[in-house]
Every structure is written in structure tokens, then in C-alpha cells.
């Protein structure tokens, strides 16, 4: 539900990089309708068959996803508005980082033209998403923001806002002093 509320902030030409929990037909169809590109890890329940579709390379092809049955949470009007099929690129990526073991990731993306993005570029997108998560984790731990102390949703928003203000104040002081973070 949170993703659906945030979709309105995405503009045509933006690229959404997300994890496998968001890789559903309805999400991808809505992103395509908005003109938003995407790179997502494939959901573990969806098995990819690289022998079908238009082959772009080894473990890299363009596939057609058929519209699944309507989920219980979706309104019939929204389901009827979805296209009958969507065209996606399915790629097996090797995400390699120094000091870490290489991870093999099956990704789904909207970049279906082979010259548009290479598998290495798609892998780079996904790795940057992972680094952002690690950076947020570092910030939360170093500033003692890793545990939220309030339970009310409105107060949680205020607490998160206070943490972000404190973080930005520390960063601005670092910039003013000329110190390297």
C-alpha cells in the first residue's frame, strides 16, 4: 500500500529500483502506464524460463507476462484497466563487489532494447540500491536512531523527522568546518 501511495511522486523517465517484494504484475503494469522505468529482483515464486521469448544474450531475454487472475485486494475496475500482457526483460545478473562474494540475481526490468542498458549496468543499479540500504543502516546505528521509541504512527513520523533534522544538522556542521566526513 505504501508503494502505491508513493507511485504518484514518480515521473516519466524516472527509474525505480526495488527488491523482489514489489515485483508483481500489477506494480509493473502501473509503472509502465506511468512511463517509469524499473529494475527489480524477480520474486522467488516466479520461475524464469530463458529458453522462451526474444533472446538478447546468455541468461538475458525479453519475455511477455500474461495478466494473472485478479488479486483479492484489487478493485474490479482497476483490474479491468490493466493491460492483458506486459513486455519485460528478464536477466540473470552477477552483482560483484570488492570484499563481498558475488551474488547472482534474477532481475526484471523495463529496458527491453539490448543497446539501452547492458546487464552490467542493470547490476550496477541494483547494487546501488543495496548500498543505499547499508548507508541508511550506518546512519541509524551511528546516531542511535536504530530503535524507534514511540508506538503511535503520528509520533513515529515526528520521531523520524527529528532524526533526519539532527542528521542534516550534523552534516551541515561538517561541511561548514571543512572536515571530511
Q: PLM features: what roles do these ranges have?
A:
Residues 1-181:
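Single, function-defining residue in the core of a domain
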